[in-house]
């Protein structure tokens, strides 16, 4: 016999699933896996760089980011304006091309090339494919994630750490 609690649980899970799918379809850009080509597109579109969201399927922190931060309209708008945005599954065997044109897998791109060991890792690359900022773990809030975007877009990474930048921003308010 199906109970109302089972129906509620099923509907709740479906709701989370659709919120997750919405975040994935709106926030992330579609790619054929050639990041060297994506760099060229980012230059042509006058973006600040490329944002890579390193993730794992069963990662609760990745899930929280997708369902509570990456699905927010102002977040989507800001990041789409300034970055090409891609997901990389750190366990993925999908073949891809790195920024320098080397063929690899998502797993090797994450582990060997960028030493990703925990998820999520929020990685920002400049228009030459050079890693300029990296944040390991989920941000504590949408505001912190937006501040991280501002930190990269306005080039603060060149002169200070994100932790120091956050502290300066709090003191100036």
Language model regions located:
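Positively charged n-region of N-terminal signal peptides that target proteins for export
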Residues: 1-6
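Thiol-based oxidoreductase modules, predominantly thioredoxin-like and allied folds used
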Residues: 30-32, 75-104
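Bacterial N-terminal signal peptides
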Residues: 7-17
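N-terminal leader/targeting and pre-domain segments
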Residues: 23-46, 158-173
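Short active-site neighborhood of thiol/selenol oxidoreductases, capturing the structured segment around
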Residues: 45-60
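Sec/Tat signal peptide C-region and signal peptidase I cleavage site
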Residues: 18-22
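Non-catalytic, surface beta->alpha helical segment in thiol-disulfide oxidoreductase systems
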Residues: 109-158
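Typically the conserved alpha-helix immediately C-terminal to a functionally engaged Cys/Sec
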Residues: 63-80
């Amino acid at each position: 016999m199906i109970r109302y609690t089972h129906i509620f649980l099923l509907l709740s899970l479906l709701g989370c699933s659709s919120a997750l799918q919405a975040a994935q379809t709106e926030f992330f850009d579609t790619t054929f896996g050639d990041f060297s080509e994506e760099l060229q597109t980012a230059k042509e579109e006058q973006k600040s760089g490329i944002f890579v969201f390193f993730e794992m399927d069963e990662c609760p922190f990745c899930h929280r980011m997708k369902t509570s931060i990456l699905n927010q309209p102002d977040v989507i708008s800001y990041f789409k304006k300034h970055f090409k945005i891609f997901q990389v599954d750190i366990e993925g065997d999908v073949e891809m091309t790195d920024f320098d044109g080397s063929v690899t897998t998502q797993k090797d791109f994450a582990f060997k090339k960028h030493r990703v060991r925990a998820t999520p890792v929020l990685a920002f690359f400049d228009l030459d494919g050079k890693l300029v900022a990296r944040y390991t773990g989920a941000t504590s809030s949408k505001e912190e994630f937006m501040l991280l975007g501002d930190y990269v877009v306005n080039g603060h990474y060149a002169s200070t750490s994100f932790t120091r930048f956050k502290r300066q921003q709090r003191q100036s308010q």
